[in-house]
């Protein structure tokens, strides 16, 4: 079938900010789809609110709108651009829900916009739990015993019939938002009321739990001629009951017999044919391990996290082909881009094993509830490829960057067996490592199977890993056993531990005896057809398929899994760096391990190595490729932390030298530099013990900011007010970084400013200066950033420019540098300097049209900024006002305090741009999920130190017609200024404020931290209740002021004469 000629312009909706459940996989899918549609000659208009994506670059679509993904804003774009069609299945759940809203409100019909790809009725049939169940019954496909409820009462009726445990799945949400497993009445009440709140349709599916069944997924494609194929099938190691995004996954499935495989394949194809899916689709099934009984769990009628994994696992570009299917092309007429010779209708075959392990944020949220269930908690994931299951699992484990390199925890010996078994019986993110520990202690596989329901096949594989450890210990230094351990994915570090050697000695032993990995190609067809994909993985076999060219090469280190503090912004910079390397005529090689990202798409670089980002794995590639040098400044802290280790092997670090990278991090050297160039910083000291820290604080004076050196995202950083808090911190936090001391600094309050600059060794260009709305003390990644600065004087701007140039030149930066300043009452101070790409690079690149990562890369290669047409200093300002607003995923993480502070907590960001600050903020806040209403009720409960400041805020809100509720202390303060406020009771009292929040009486909560156990607990409960009821909770008065200004600009104030 030829492609459709009746449509010319297609609108693509992106997935918005990165949140738990919806991460970088949609940037990858959206980028592929836009390029595929342009390739076919269509005009593409993209709307997405996330500036940190490749997809929102001007080259990707013909027109790019970075606007909030809400009905009103998209409707405006549709009226303005008059597209012929809308493609909704590439923007995750956000894109799908938008398409449904635009259809239901009549916007699509009024503007003659057709939906492409899967029909809306099919989407609703797959997403609406009631319709889906009816269709499955018609097809005779078994679904778990279930009921649809719209109220909590209905849920209890269903419980009477089937009993516990029950699984709750809200309709039209993703990542299992609001869902969970209930074992008793209390949990049922809480989870169902929560689920109804998060479901746009106020609808939940309750189903009898089939926990313990195997969870199997099929990633399928279908076109309009009813050609349908399975791209990949995957098996969750964790049985049903843990969200697939939080499960360890293996592809292809390992424990299915051929009969089971074919049976589930047939069902998957039958279901997508019945639904009339056109494009990619993910089918999740549950299989009883003891019979041929199965159930269908759910169908995602769109490109998903699993399809990104399937694309990277097989090399088959699902999103690209799904976009082409949407405009009428069929599988049997499109070539598979990987082979270039076979058609897309051939099902991929794998001659290797893939392991995916989720990356959880519990290293940042130590108090977060770790138990896993049907609501997703992982922020990202890693994938590894091996020739044996053991090899791919161990490679994936060391890709996680948890400080874990093997099947066990670093301090595993110290736990007693009862504790280990207790941890195994709970489903949490560390269970895999505790299983390894239990096997080491001789626990039987039967006992572990009974506790976990994990298939014996996998338990035997874990046992094999432990057996090899014992063999290494018994045959220390034996080359045969070294080779054998390498075949099964053991790292040099692990072998060194068992051989009683250093890692370096094992590495040398391997080199002397030529025990090196070879690299195999990922070609979708198990070498059945000719293929020329430059996509490789390492393994210890004989034939090497990665042919080394004689071109000069530059190796770029990626940033690994998405986690808090290191998001998709670093992938953005990596991809741009690669483009610049290619334009300069070098061969660009990427090493990365994140299946969700654009950088791990085989078509981006000249060669892609899908390998762990560890010293050993990267050195193996360098030994083969012998690049001119390695670039570390675009891969976040992951890459920077490898610089030292690679340099020890004589590898050339391109760009800012290792010595200068270390000067920016080393306290004493950095202070010496600041004195020399005459740039002030807050008074500070270094401490290696609690006693020293207390002495430092006494000299500087409280409050002080404490943090370990060498961390990203403000990990383990705190503001402390007294000796007791400091002692507590020193005993907890010195863990955060044992080799490095703790920094104790004077805490300066004032405006925080962030600057990104590029330096080629001679010229420093500053694309822009950003002012933070939240004062210093809130992590820059959690602050709202504004460009251009709104409240700075000419003098302050000149000082910032001067200091930035001095710092970049003083550190001999070649490439990018990110600096944070604070403007205190007595001048500008430098807070920190990061000699690398930062979180704000994509944001500034989009605003100013200065391709920062590309310029930095060109400077690294040796080009001069003046030759590219740039002058030193701050570049001309772009027109308009732009804000970058953070987006949090607190509703997915229980027991995490949402108070903003020096430790980063946001998972993503949105951009708002307009002609005034208030309009830009309105877009930023709206895009980040804060509903800005021009009237309503605000609840205020603030600490004593903030009571004076909250008065002005209350006055403004009162004048625009907001009703104020306040706790007694805050209300008394407001009464002094004649501001009316209704007093609400403390927790547990009469007219208790939690009840008011739960009843929906409140639209905004303003709550600032008070220290002290009792009040901290109260404050924590207030903040959690607010988040769990989906109400904006502002913990910084600066954010509250910004919101108030926006509300004020939307309405008229009412004052008596």
Swiss-Prot record:
Residues 930-1057 are annotated as: Allosteric domain. Residues 402-546 are annotated as: Oligomerization domain. Residues 133-327, 671-861 form the ATP-grasp domain. CDD domains: MGS_CPS_II (cd01424). It comes from the Bacteria. It catalyses: hydrogencarbonate + L-glutamine + 2 ATP + H2O = carbamoyl phosphate + L-glutamate + 2 ADP + phosphate + 2 H(+). Composed of two chains; the small (or glutamine) chain promotes the hydrolysis of glutamine to ammonia, which is used by the large (or ammonia) chain to synthesize carbamoyl phosphate. Tetramer of heterodimers (alpha,beta)4. Large subunit of the glutamine-dependent carbamoyl phosphate synthetase (CPSase). CPSase catalyzes the formation of carbamoyl phosphate from the ammonia moiety of glutamine, carbonate, and phosphate donated by ATP, constituting the first step of 2 biosynthetic pathways, one leading to arginine and/or urea and the other to pyrimidine nucleotides. This is Carbamoyl phosphate synthase large chain. The lineage of its organism: Bacteria, Bacillati, Bacillota, Bacilli, Bacillales. The gene is carB.
């Amino acid at each position: 079938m030829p492609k459709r000629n009746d449509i010319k312009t297609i609108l693509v909706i992106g997935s918005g900010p990165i949140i738990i459940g919806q991460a970088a996989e949609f940037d990858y899918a959206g980028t592929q789809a836009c390029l595929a549609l342009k390739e076919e000659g269509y005009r593409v208009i993209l709307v997405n609110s996330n500036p940190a994506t490749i997809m929102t670059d001007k080259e990707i679509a013909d027109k790019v709108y970075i606007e909030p993904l809400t009905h009103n804003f998209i409707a405006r774009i549709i009226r303005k651009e008059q597209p012929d069609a809308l493609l909704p299945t590439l923007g995750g759940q956000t894109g799908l829900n938008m398409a449904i809203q635009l259809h239901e409100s009549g916007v699509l019909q009024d503007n003659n916009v057709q939906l492409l790809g899967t029909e809306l009725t099919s989407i609703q049939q797959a997403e609406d739990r009631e319709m889906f169940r009816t269709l499955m019954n018609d097809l005779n496909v078994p679904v778990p015993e279930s009921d649809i409820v719209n109220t909590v009462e209905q849920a209890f009726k269903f419980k009477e019939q089937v009993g516990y445990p029950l699984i709750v799945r809200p309709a039209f949400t993703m990542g299992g938002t609001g869902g969970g497993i209930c074992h008793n009445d209390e949990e049922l009440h809480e989870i169902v009321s929560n689920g109804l709140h998060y479901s746009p349709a106020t609808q939940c599916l309750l189903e009898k739990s089939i926990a313990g069944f195997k969870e199997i997924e099929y990633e399928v494609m279908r076109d309009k001629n009813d050609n349908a194929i399975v791209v990949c099938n995957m098996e969750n190691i964790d049985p049903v009951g843990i969200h697939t995004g939080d499960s360890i996954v293996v592809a292809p499935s390992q424990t299915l017999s051929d009969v089971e495989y074919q049976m589930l394949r047939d069902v998957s194809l039958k279901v997508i044919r019945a639904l009339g899916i056109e494009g990619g689709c993910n089918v999740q099934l549950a299989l009883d391990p003891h019979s041929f009984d199965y159930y269908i769990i759910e169908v995602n009628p769109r490109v998903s996290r699993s399809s990104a994994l399937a694309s990277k696992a097989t090399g088959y570009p699902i999103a690209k082909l799904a976009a082409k299917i949407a405009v009428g092309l069929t599988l049997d007429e499109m070539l598979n881009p990987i082979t270039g010779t076979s058609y897309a209708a051939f099902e991929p075959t794998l001659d290797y094993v893939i392991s995916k392990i989720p990356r959880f944020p519990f290293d940042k949220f130590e108090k977060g509830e770790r138990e896993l269930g049907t609501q997703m908690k992982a922020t990202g994931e890693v994938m590894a490829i091996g020739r044996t299951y053991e090899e791919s699992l161990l490679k994936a484990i060391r890709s996680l960057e948890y400080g874990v390199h093997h099947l066990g925890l670093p301090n595993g010996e110290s736990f007693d067996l009862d504790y280990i078994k207790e941890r195994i019986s709970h489903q949490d993110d560390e269970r895999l490592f505790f299983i390894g520990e239990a096997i080491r202690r001789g626990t039987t596989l039967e006992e572990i199977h009974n506790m976990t329901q994990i298939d014996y096949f996998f338990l035997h594989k874990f046992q094999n890993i432990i057996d090899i450890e014992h063999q290494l210990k018994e045959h220390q230094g034996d080359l045969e056993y070294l080779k054998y351990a390498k075949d099964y994915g053991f790292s040099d570090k692990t072998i060194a531990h068992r051989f009683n050697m250093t890692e370096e000695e094992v590495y040398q032993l391997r080199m002397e005896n030529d025990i090196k990995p070879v690299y195999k190609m990922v070609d979708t067809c198990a070498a059945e057809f000719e293929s020329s994909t430059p996509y490789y993985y390492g393994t210890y076999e004989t034939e090497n398929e990665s042919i080394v060219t004689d071109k000069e090469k530059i190796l770029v280190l990626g940033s690994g899994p998405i986690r808090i503090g290191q998001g998709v912004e670093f992938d953005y910079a990596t991809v741009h760096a690669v483009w610049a390397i290619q334009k300069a005529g070098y061969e660009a090689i990427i090493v990365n391990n994140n299946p969700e990202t654009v950088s791990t798409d085989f078509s981006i670089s000249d060669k892609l190595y899908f390998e762990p980002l560890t010293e050993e794995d990267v050195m193996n590639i360098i030994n083969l490729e012998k690049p001119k040098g390695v670039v570390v400044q675009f891969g976040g802290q992951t890459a920077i932390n490898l610089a030292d280790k690679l340099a020890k092997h004589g590898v050339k670090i391109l760009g800012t030298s290792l010595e200068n990278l270390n000067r920016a991090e080393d306290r004493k050297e950095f202070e010496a530099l600041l004195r020399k160039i005459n740039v002030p910083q807050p008074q500070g000291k270094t401490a290696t013990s609690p006693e020293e820290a207390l002495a430092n604080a006494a000299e500087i004076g409280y409050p002080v900011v404490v943090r370990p050196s060498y961390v990203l995202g403000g990990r383990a950083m705190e503001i402390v007010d007294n000796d007791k808090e400091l002692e507590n911190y020193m005993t907890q936090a010195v863990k955060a970084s044992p080799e490095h001391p703790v920094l104790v600094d004077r805490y300066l309050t004032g405006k925080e400013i962030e600057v990104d600059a590029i330096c080629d060794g001679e010229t420093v260009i500053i694309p822009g200066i950003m002012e933070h709305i939240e004062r210093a003390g809130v992590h820059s990644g959690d602050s709202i950033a504004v460009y251009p600065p709104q409240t700075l004087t000419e003098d302050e701007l000149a000082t910032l420019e001067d200091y930035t140039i001095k710092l970049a030149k003083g550190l001999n930066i070649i490439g990018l540098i990110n600096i944070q300043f604070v403007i205190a009452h007595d001048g500008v101070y430098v807070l920190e300097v990061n000699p690398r790409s930062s979180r704000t690079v994509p944001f500034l690149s989009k605003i100013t049209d200065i391709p920062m990562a590309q310029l930095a890369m060109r400077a690294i290669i040796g080009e001069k900024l003046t030759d590219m047409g740039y002058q030193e200093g701050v570049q001309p300002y772009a027109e308009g006002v732009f804000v970058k607003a953070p987006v949090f995923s607190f509703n997915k993480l229980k027991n995490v305090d949402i108070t903003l502070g020096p430790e980063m907590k946001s998972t993503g960001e949105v951009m708002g741009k307009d002609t005034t600050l208030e309009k830009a903020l309105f877009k930023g806040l709206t895009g980040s999920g804060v509903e800005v209403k021009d009237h309503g009720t605000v609840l205020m409960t603030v600490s004593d130190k903030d009571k004076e400041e909250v008065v002005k805020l209350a006055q403004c809100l009162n004048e625009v017609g907001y009703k104020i509720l306040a706790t007694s202390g805050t209300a008394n303060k407001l009464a002094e200024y004649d501001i009316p406020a209704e007093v609400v009771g403390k927790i547990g009292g009469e007219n208790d404020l939690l009840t008011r929040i739960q009843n929906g009486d409140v639209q905004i909560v303003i709550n600032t931290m008070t220290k002290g156990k009792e009040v901290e607990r109260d404050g924590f409960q207030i903040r959690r209740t607010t988040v769990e009821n989906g109400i904006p909770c502002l913990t910084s008065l600066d954010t509250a002021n910004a919101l108030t200004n926006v509300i004020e600009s939307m309405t008229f104030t009412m004052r008596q004469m």
